[in-house]
Amino acid sequence: MKRLIILLFAIGITAMSSMSMAAMSNSRVRKETRFLTDKMAYELNLNTQQYNDVYEINFDFIYSIRYLMDDVIRGYEWALDDYYNYLDVRNDDLRWVLSDSQYRRFLGLDYFYRPIYANTGGWNFRVYITYTNHNHFYFPKPYHYRSYSGGHYRTHFHNVSYYRGRYNHSHYRGN
């Protein structure tokens, strides 16, 4: 009887952790990334190259924080620090892709600049507050929607932005 209870408990724990992990599968990361990037392209008037690069940057960010956010909600300080590090990398990479005027507009829109909000009930993307139709897209999928898997993240480039120097427009310099 004791073994049966322990076995059922172990199965229950495994099922709950699997459901938590399944909450942000790779396909969901791609879907969330596409939705956020599509709205950024629409509001910031991105060209095709920018659209594809912003998709990569958003993918890297969402992929990196997808399981971390549960620990942020639990109140772990290390998780919050990690979250803000990932957010800083994302926003700095975007600085190299967006023009000065696009980046200034980006800074003024919380649902782009700080795309995730958390409360005691969980976490979600701010963009869904403004854009309530989750199935409406202004643009087709990025050309590498199914194939991109993080190859341009900073750890692959000695912690230097892959996007630095790829564009010839003026960049936001913080002034």
Stretches found by the model and what they are:
Residues 13, 20-21, 38-46:
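Short, charged, low-complexity loops and linkers
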Residues 26-38, 42, 49-175:
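Low-complexity segments
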